[in-house]
């Protein structure tokens, strides 16, 4: 009996040791700090993206094109602001909540009355090469499934650097919905100087580019 007990204890300890090597800091709490190695991986992703100002200008140009195409093929549609979103976000959304960067979202615009299905097909047909040239791909299906056919109501877009454009047509019961989001990007000035004091981690005010825990450095304190 004692031998069986000792064997069981040893087995349990072995399993515990194995699990300890596999469990990540945020395994049980997805909002917990995932560890310095993972934070550095995410920071390198953001550092490799274009400056925030570059993305803002690209989205401003695309915004003008989107509105022009809607006005061209659906002149009856008028835009209004439905939901106001903060234009200046100090920090980034998940999974980059502990990353040094900034993210901005547009307001949510509604177009009434919505384009007819025929008008919508003309609109998205003209927008398709514009989005492709800007590096976007459709973001209107679940992962693993092909995009919805051209002319489907949802013609939302996504780009590899995290930029998103939500563009969904309505019908005779609801309006067209449109908004965009820059994704997490470093402002150009943050590559040559630290962020303003009020935008640095409260416990790590001496952060500097490239904002890494590993070489070549830039962060020294664990993120909250």
From Swiss-Prot:
InterPro entries: LppA/LppB/LprP (IPR032018). A lipid is attached at residue 22 (N-palmitoyl cysteine). Keywords: Cell membrane, Lipoprotein, Membrane, Palmitate, Signal. It comes from the Bacteria. A lipid is attached at residue 22 (S-diacylglycerol cysteine). It is a lipid-anchor. Pfam families: LppA (PF16708). It is found in: Cell membrane. PROSITE patterns: PROKAR_LIPOPROTEIN (PS51257). One of its GO terms (cellular component) is plasma membrane. Residues 1-21 form the signal peptide. To M.bovis LprP. This is Uncharacterized lipoprotein LprP. The lineage of its organism: Bacteria, Bacillati, Actinomycetota, Actinomycetes, Mycobacteriales.
